[in-house]
C-alpha cells in the first residue's frame, strides 16, 4: 500500500514533507509495536524528531499508542503501532479536496477573461485589470490580454488524471 504514489504524497504532506517519516512507518509496519526510543535508536534519528513525526501520524489517526508507567522511575513509556486501515479513506478525502479545487479553478479559468503583466509575470482577472486601468499595480507596465487555453487544458489533464487514478485504484473502490 505504501508504494502507491498517491498514498506517498498524502503521507508526505501529513509528515510535513519529512522523508524520515517513511522510515518511521516502515519500522512500525515491520515491528508492529515499538517504542519511540527504539525507533530513534534503530534509525539513528533524534528522539524529538521521531516524536514529532509520530504525533503528526497520530493526529491523522494513522498510528495508535499505549502508555505504560514505570513504577520505579514514574516515567511513561509509549509503545506505538501502525493503524493504516484508515489510509485509503484519508487519501480519498484529500484527493476529493484536490479535485474540487482543480474543478473550481477550471470554472474560474473558463468563465473569465484574464490580463497579464509580462514584466512581473502576474495574471489578473478582467475586473482587476480594469480597476487598475490595465496597468500592472506592481510595476505600472501595460497589461496584455492573456490566452488561458493552455491553463484550461492543463487543468483538464490534471482533473482527468486524478479521476482516472481514483477510479482505477482498488484501494478507493469503497470511497
Swiss-Prot record:
<keyword id="KW-0238">DNA-binding</keyword>
<dbReference type="InterPro" id="IPR024550">
    <property type="entry name" value="TFIIEa/SarR/Rpc3_HTH_dom"/>
</dbReference>
<dbReference type="InterPro" id="IPR017919">
    <property type="entry name" value="TFIIE/TFIIEa_HTH"/>
</dbReference>
<comment type="similarity">
    <text>Belongs to the TFE family.</text>
</comment>
<dbReference type="InterPro" id="IPR039997">
    <property type="entry name" value="TFE"/>
</dbReference>
<dbReference type="InterPro" id="IPR016481">
    <property type="entry name" value="TF_E_archaea"/>
</dbReference>
<comment type="subunit">
    <text>Monomer. Interaction with RNA polymerase subunits RpoF and RpoE is necessary for Tfe stimulatory transcription activity. Able to interact with Tbp and RNA polymerase in the absence of DNA promoter. Interacts both with the preinitiation and elongation complexes.</text>
</comment>
<dbReference type="Pfam" id="PF02002">
    <property type="entry name" value="TFIIE_alpha"/>
</dbReference>
<keyword id="KW-0805">Transcription regulation</keyword>
<protein>
    <recommendedName>
        <fullName>Transcription factor E</fullName>
    </recommendedName>
</protein>
<dbReference type="GO" id="GO:0006367">
    <property type="term" value="P:transcription initiation at RNA polymerase II promoter"/>
</dbReference>
<dbReference type="InterPro" id="IPR036390">
    <property type="entry name" value="WH_DNA-bd_sf"/>
</dbReference>
<dbReference type="GO" id="GO:0006355">
    <property type="term" value="P:regulation of DNA-templated transcription"/>
</dbReference>
<dbReference type="GO" id="GO:0003677">
    <property type="term" value="F:DNA binding"/>
</dbReference>
<dbReference type="InterPro" id="IPR002853">
    <property type="entry name" value="TFIIE_asu"/>
</dbReference>
<dbReference type="InterPro" id="IPR036388">
    <property type="entry name" value="WH-like_DNA-bd_sf"/>
</dbReference>
<keyword id="KW-0804">Transcription</keyword>
<feature type="domain" description="HTH TFE/IIEalpha-type">
    <location>
        <begin position="3"/>
        <end position="88"/>
    </location>
</feature>
<comment type="function">
    <text>Transcription factor that plays a role in the activation of archaeal genes transcribed by RNA polymerase. Facilitates transcription initiation by enhancing TATA-box recognition by TATA-box-binding protein (Tbp), and transcription factor B (Tfb) and RNA polymerase recruitment. Not absolutely required for transcription in vitro, but particularly important in cases where Tbp or Tfb function is not optimal. It dynamically alters the nucleic acid-binding properties of RNA polymerases by stabilizing the initiation complex and destabilizing elongation complexes.</text>
</comment>
Amino acid at each position: 500500500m505504501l508504494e502507491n504514489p498517491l498514498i506517498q504524497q498524502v503521507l508526505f504532506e501529513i509528515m510535513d514533507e519529512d522523508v524520515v517519516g517513511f522510515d518511521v512507518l516502515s519500522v512500525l509496519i515491520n515491528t508492529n509495536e515499538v517504542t519511540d526510543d527504539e525507533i530513534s535508536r534503530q534509525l539513528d534519528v533524534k528522539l524529538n524528531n521521531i516524536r514529532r513525526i509520530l504525533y503528526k501520524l497520530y493526529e491523522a489517526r494513522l498510528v495508535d499508542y499505549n502508555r505504560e508507567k514505570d513504577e520505579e522511575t514514574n516515567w511513561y513509556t509509549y509503545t506505538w503501532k501502525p493503524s493504516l486501515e484508515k489510509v485509503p479513506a484519508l487519501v480519498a478525502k484529500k484527493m476529493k479536496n484536490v479535485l474540487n479545487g482543480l474543478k473550481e479553478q477550471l470554472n474560474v479559468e473558463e468563465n473569465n477573461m484574464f490580463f497579464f503583466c509580462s514584466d512581473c509575470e502576474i495574471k489578473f482577472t478582467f475586473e482587476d485589470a480594469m480597476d487598475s486601468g490595465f496597468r500592472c499595480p506592481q510595476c505600472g507596465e501595460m497589461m496584455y490580454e492573456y490566452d488561458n487555453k493552455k491553463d484550461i487544458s492543463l487543468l483538464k489533464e490534471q482533473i482527468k488524471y486524478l479521476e482516472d487514478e481514483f477510479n482505477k485504484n482498488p484501494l478507493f473502490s469503497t470511497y
